[in-house]
Each structure stands twice: as structure tokens, then as C-alpha cells.
Amino acid sequence: MKSDYINRDVMGHILFALNPVNRLVCKVALETGLRIGDILEFKTFDIVFKKSFTIREQKTGKSRKITLREPLRKELQDISGTYYVFEHRTDPHKHRARQTVYTDIKRVCKLFKVKENISPHSIRKLYAVDMYKKTGDMSKVQKALLHDNELTTMLYALSDILHSKKR
């Protein structure tokens, strides 16, 4: 089942109720548009010692340069583990699992009786919608999401409209 779009107000309520570390993962996703799996692989060294760093996306294998706003970078530094920013609960040599973030989001959605199918990927759609509204330029959104196909980008950037028509 595909993840649904969710507006910023509802997302704000969901973020508020998440576990603090999972909330921070989602805040990074809202700022960067990255997939959760890519965020969970952030290395402590990169966050502490670099203003910008490059990641290789798991799904596409494409490289992307990341620059975080200083307040968010500081939050990440404060929770950083020995090797990964988002350390695994029992093994510091592993990062937190994607399933952990997913399960927490599902828990909160159930608590708030959210009918839409919200998942971490819904945040990527919200990022695309916000960027498209801000810039009005589909090619900028496509570049930010590293999509090869503009039609794929349109599904993300216009997901608010598609969601409202579905209702």
C-alpha cells in the first residue's frame, strides 16, 4: 500500500507525539527530503566535523550533498552515537532500523485515529509539495528528490491535490 500525503498541521501533531529520536529523524526528512533509510545512515563524524557532507542514496546509488541548518545540526550532534548519529538500541556499530521509525509513526497515527496511510515516506511527499509551492518549479523538485522521471516527481509534488481529489 502506498503512503498518503499528509498536511503540515497534522504532521506537526504526529511529530509532537513521536519518540524524541524518531522525531528528529523526521525533522531531518522534512528539511532535506531524504528517505528515512538514508538519514539513519548519517555518520557522527560528518555531523560533528563538517558543515556539508555527501551521502550515497541507498535506493538509487546517487550521491547528494547535504547541508543542514545549524540548529538542526546541533540537535543531531547532541544525540549522536559513537559511529552513527542514530545509533541502534543495542549495538553502537549499527544504526537505528527504519522499522523503528515506521512503527512509532504508525503508533501515533493509531493514537490520533488518522485515517490516511501515513508512513515515513509521507514526509518526502510533504517536502516535495512544500518545495513546489515555494518555487513553482517542477525541475527543482525533481533535482532535490533525485528523480530520473518528471512524472514521478509530479506524483510527489502534486500529492496534496491528488489526495484531496481522492477523498
Regions picked out by a protein language model, each given a short descriptive name:
Residues 4-32, 36:
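Basic, Lys/Arg- and aromatic-enriched nucleic-acid-binding interface segment
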Residues 5-8, 32, 41-74:
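Conserved tyrosine-mediated DNA breakage-rejoining catalytic core shared by Y-recombinases
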Residues 29-31, 132-133, 157:
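Short amphipathic helical patch at the helix-1/turn junction of helix-turn-helix
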Residues 38-39, 117-118, 128, 136-147:
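Active-site-proximal segment of tyrosine recombinases
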Residues 47-50, 137-157, 161-162:
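Short, polar N-cap/turn motifs at the start of nucleic acid-interacting alpha helices
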Residues 58-77, 83-106:
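C-terminal catalytic core of Y-nucleophile DNA break-rejoin enzymes
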Residues 123, 127:
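Active-site His/Glu-centered metal-binding helix of metallohydrolases
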